[in-house]
Amino acid sequence: MASTTDMSTYKLNHTMIRVKDLDKSLKFYTEVFGMKLIDQWVFEENEFSLSFLAFDGPGALNHGVERSKREGILELTYNFGTEKKEGPVYINGNTEPKRGFGHICFTVDNIESACAYLESKGVSFKKKLSDGKMKHIAFALDPDNYWIELVSQSETKPKANISNFRFNHTMVRVKDPEPSIAFYEKLGMKVIDKADHPNGKFTNYFLAYPSDLPRHDREGLLELTHNWGTEKESGPVYHNGNDGDEKGYGHVCISVDNINAACSKFEAEGLPFKKKLTDGRMKDIAFLLDPDNYWVEVIEQK
């Protein structure tokens, strides 16, 4: 086994969220958005399952690529029996005092047509194109009220085709962008774009692994949102989706060429671990903690 690791091969593989009713969520993402269930693990003994969804049609960016070697995967974690509970089970990360995770984003080939299509399918919206000042983005709501941002790709087609949609990015809010960016750079990611919004007093940073594609045509991006001034607050500002009784968002996951070498490198860099490879029964995965205590899973490419 090689003792080195090549960060240029790393992928931002997936984003995990917990869902109340798996059947309802699978139907939403596959039948409405056209995603494909590319893998599923059921743990009867522990009473939960993991379902991995991706855009995988003939025109998809990562069509047919092995699960661990691709980007743009959505992992749905389902704990048996939650669908029988009354009311919402999970938090979406956008309401105080449990803000943290913000949204996932799908880029589309014609945003007006895509939004009209989603409305025809009965999809609820947090923000329609016509709402507010920003007429070029919309936010749909999934069955658990997680936000799905909709943004145009670099080229607009005459009519939206769900087979061209891409799982572009995942957004989390960060207290202080400097240590957060430094952390993700130690994972091999780079800031590929930055957008300041003086009126709203926030900045968005987009990080990713190397690619020649325009930002809106890619998959596997991480968006860090910094609300100006939070870095001056004492203690944690955001909820990571995993701590305490109220859960929702789980983690992002990077896949690496050599997990032993990668974790050794991360440890040498002083990055904190939630779970080291040697911890627990699962010796083939690790979890890092970023500066806001968000979990970052590490898996090996097959």
Curated annotation (Swiss-Prot):
Matching InterPro entries: Glyas_Bleomycin-R_OHBP_Dase (IPR029068), Glyas_Fos-R_dOase_dom (IPR004360), Glyoxalase_1 (IPR004361), Glyoxalase_1_CS (IPR018146), VOC (IPR037523)
Keyword Repeat: yes
Binding partners and assembly: Monomer.
Listed name of the protein: Lactoylglutathione lyase
UniProt keyword terms in alphabetical order: Cobalt, Lyase, Manganese, Metal-binding, Nickel, Repeat, Zinc
Keyword Repeat attributed: yes
Catalytic reaction annotation: (R)-S-lactoylglutathione = methylglyoxal + glutathione
GO cellular component: cytosol; nucleus
Gene designation per UniProt: glo1
Biological pathway: Secondary metabolite metabolism; methylglyoxal degradation; (R)-lactate from methylglyoxal: step 1/2
Record GO biological process: cellular detoxification; cellular response to osmotic stress; glutathione metabolic process; methylglyoxal catabolic process to D-lactate via S-lactoyl-glutathione
Protein residues bound to substrate: 18, 79, 99, 103
Domain of life according to the entry: Eukaryota
Binding-site residues, Zn(2+): 14, 75, 103, 149
Domain VOC: 11-153, 166-301
